[in-house]
Each structure stands twice: as structure tokens, then as C-alpha cells.
């Protein structure tokens, strides 16, 4: 017979980790289920060395450091953590029965903090791309590229941020198919004032190498036949990620474009199931780590009140505990 938990959190990224910690402050019995092999979500797996800019009070905080601090914070409590375990169904009985790829769990409430779901990078679609060993989609140790010629493809926050990071240690070129970047204004200004070589509006058109090591990248100006060739040692593709919410559509929750619709309590269309972070939707929702961290206490406190209506939604402040 499965143990009965007060709160089961689906997702072990930053928002899920903080929700678990806060649930312990309310003395809830809580567990975490995550489909990934490690805690931390995208910041830990995809951006361990990228600076996280939207966590207040922590300048120069990397994805790995954020993850480690949240895990350290949670380690003060006994929290069962189930990794490599995918949630298949959530069935409302007397309690909630969660069926996963490895078994089943019973819980009084559920907080879904699964971010954008399963994710994989959008690939560079050029002939022969699969064979090149120096084409990368994420950075695990930036220092190994010191002094190398680096070219980055993309125009969003990740591409701009990585260009600024690489500029400190390597000759860096950024290629984007549009004149304007889809990144924070402050970052774009820093890019324009940096030593990064900016190629816009250009798109990659041909890979030049021996099939294993890429030596040059041909780029073509958009709506033109003009071409240029870039010498490089490493090519980083930052075209964003394809995400999949998997079985979410089968859980009987109201959705808005694959996001869970929630009310002001962070509660879904099913009473007792809450959603926080990038997986939830409400009018005016902003997808930031900081936003999700703020949503976590709202979901936890309302889950506590759902379990026991005599428990106040507004708890004591942590400074008075």
C-alpha cells in the first residue's frame, strides 16, 4: 500500500524544489516526482553555467548554483524524491491516485511544476549536421572553449547571453536571421557595446568541414545572394527548445495551449490540483523563474487549506516562526 502524502509535487526544477521546501515549513508531508534523471530542470541540465538574471538578490548566479542552493535548502527536511519517473495519470478517488511509469502514489493534493514539460533543442537543419562533433546545443563547461573561435546561432535571450559569456574568454561571432534580437533590452545593449562580431540579418547556409570537424560556416544574407564565410572552432545552436507536455492532456484539466489554466489560488479546474511555474496559465502570466517562485507559496498554502479548511491560507511569516 502506497503512503499517503499531503502534497505531491510533479516536477523537480527550481519552482518545484522551492514549493517542496515551503510545504515543509507548513509541516506538510511532501514528495517530488520528476521524469528527469536529476533535480534542477532546464537550468541544471541545459544552462548549468549560464547566469540566471531573474532571481532577486543573487547577481552572477548560474543555473548550477541556483539548483545546488535550492537542493541544500530542501536537504534540511526528509523529502522522498522519485527521479526518472513519468506521471501517466492522475485519478481523483477518495484521494488522488497518481500512476507513473514506475508505480503508483496516493496524495491528498497535487502541485504540478513541470515547466514546459520534456524538452529537446531545435536542431540546425543543414546537410551533414549530424556528423560534426563540434556543433553543440548546450554548454556544460565554458572554460574548455577558452581561446577558441566560437560562433553562436540565434537571436533570443540564450543566444545573446551566451555570446556575452563567451566574449570574455574567446573570439565570438553571433549570427541571427533578423536585424532585431528577442532578448532583454539590457542584454542587447551590452551585446552592442561588446566585442562580439554580430552578423545580421544572416542565416547559416552551408557547413564546411570533413564531416567530423566543422572548420567554416557559410552564411547567406536574408533575401539576398550575398554570402560570407566564418572560420570557427565550435558552433553553438541556440534556436530554443521543442517542449512536450506528454500525458498532461489526459489528466482532465482545462488547458490553454498546453498550459494548465489556474485561478488566483493557482488551482486548476480540478479542485486539489494546483499548477505553478511555466506550465500554468492565467491572464497576465509571465514565464520567469522569479514568477514561479512566487506562485509556489500560493499553491502550497491553498493546498493546506484544501486538506484542512481550518488551516489559514495566510500563514505566519517565516520571520515569526
Curated annotation (Swiss-Prot):
Q: Known catalysed reaction(s)? A: 2 reduced [2Fe-2S]-[ferredoxin] + NADP(+) + H(+) = 2 oxidized [2Fe-2S]-[ferredoxin] + NADPH
This entry's comment on the bound cofactor is:
Binds 1 FAD per subunit.
Q: Indicate the secretion signal residues.
A: none
Matching InterPro entries: FAD/NAD-bd_sf (IPR036188), FAD/NAD-binding_dom (IPR023753), Fd--NADP_Rdtase_type_2 (IPR022890), Ferredoxin-NADP_redctase_2 (IPR050097)
Query: Where along this sequence does the record place binding of FAD?
Result: 34, 42, 47, 87, 119, 278, 319
According to its UniProt record, this protein's enzyme class is oxidoreductase
User: Species name for this entry?
Assistant: Streptococcus pneumoniae serotype 4 (strain ATCC BAA-334 / TIGR4)
Would you identify the family this protein belongs to, as annotated? Answer: Belongs to the ferredoxin--NADP reductase type 2 family.
Q: Which SUPFAM superfamilies match?
A: FAD/NAD(P)-binding domain (SSF51905)
Keyword Oxidoreductase belongs to the record:
yes
Q: Which HAMAP family match?
A: FENR2
Essential cofactor(s) = FAD
The record's Pfam families line, in alphabetical order, gives: Pyr_redox_2
Q: What is this protein called?
A: Ferredoxin--NADP reductase
Look up the EC number in the record and give it: 1.18.1.2
The UniProt subunit note reads as follows: Homodimer.
Supply the alphabetized keyword list.
FAD, Flavoprotein, NADP, Oxidoreductase
Q: Which PANTHER family match?
A: THIOREDOXIN REDUCTASE 1-RELATED-RELATED (PTHR48105)
The highest taxon in the source lineage is Bacteria
MF terms from GO for this chain are: ferredoxin-NADP+ reductase activity; flavin adenine dinucleotide binding; NADP binding
Amino acid at each position: 500500500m502506497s503512503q499517503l502524502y499531503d502534497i505531491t509535487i510533479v516536477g523537480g526544477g527550481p519552482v518545484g524544489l522551492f514549493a517542496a521546501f515551503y510545504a515543509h515549513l507548513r509541516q506538510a508531508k511532501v514528495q517530488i516526482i520528476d521524469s528527469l534523471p536529476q533535480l534542477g530542470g532546464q537550468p541544471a541540465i541545459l544552462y548549468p553555467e549560464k547566469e540566471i538574471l531573474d532571481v532577486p538578490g543573487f547577481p552572477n548566479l548560474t543555473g548550477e548554483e541556483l539548483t545546488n542552493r535550492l537542493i541544500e535548502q530542501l536537504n534540511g527536511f526528509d523529502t522522498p524524491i522519485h527521479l526518472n519517473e513519468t506521471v501517466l495519470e492522475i485519478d481523483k478517488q477518495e484521494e488522488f491516485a497518481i500512476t507513473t511509469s514506475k508505480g503508483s502514489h496516493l496524495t491528498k493534493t497535487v502541485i504540478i511544476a513541470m515547466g514546459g514539460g520534456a524538452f529537446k533543442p531545435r536542431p540546425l537543419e543543414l546537410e551533414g549536421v549530424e556528423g560534426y562533433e563540434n556543433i553543440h546545443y548546450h554548454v556544460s563547461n565554458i572554460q574548455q572553449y577558452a581561446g577558441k573561435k566560437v560562433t553562436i546561432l540565434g537571436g533570443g535571450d540564450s543566444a545573446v547571453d551566451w555570446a556575452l559569456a563567451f566574449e570574455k574568454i574567446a573570439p565570438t561571432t553571433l549570427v541571427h536571421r533578423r536585424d532585431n534580437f528577442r532578448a532583454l533590452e539590457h542584454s542587447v545593449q551590452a551585446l552592442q557595446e561588446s566585442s562580439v562580431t554580430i552578423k545580421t540579418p544572416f542565416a547559416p547556409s552551408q557547413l564546411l568541414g570533413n564531416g567530423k570537424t566543422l572548420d567554416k560556416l557559410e552564411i547567406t544574407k536574408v533575401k539576398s545572394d550575398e554570402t560570407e564565410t566564418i572560420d570557427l572552432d565550435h558552433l553553438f545552436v541556440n534556436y530554443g527548445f521543442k517542449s512536450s507536455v506528454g500525458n498532461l492532456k489526459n489528466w482532465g484539466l482545462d488547458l490553454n495551449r498546453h498550459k494548465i489554466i489556474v485561478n488566483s489560488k493557482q488551482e486548476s479546474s480540478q479542485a486539489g490540483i494546483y499548477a505553478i511555474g511555466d506550465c500554468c496559465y492565467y491572464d497576465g502570466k509571465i514565464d520567469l523563474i522569479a514568477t514561479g517562485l512566487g506562485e509556489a507559496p500560493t499553491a502550497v498554502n491553498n493546498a493546506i487549506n484544501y486538506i484542512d479548511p481550518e488551516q489559514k491560507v495566510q500563514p505566519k511569516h517565516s520571520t515569526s516562526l
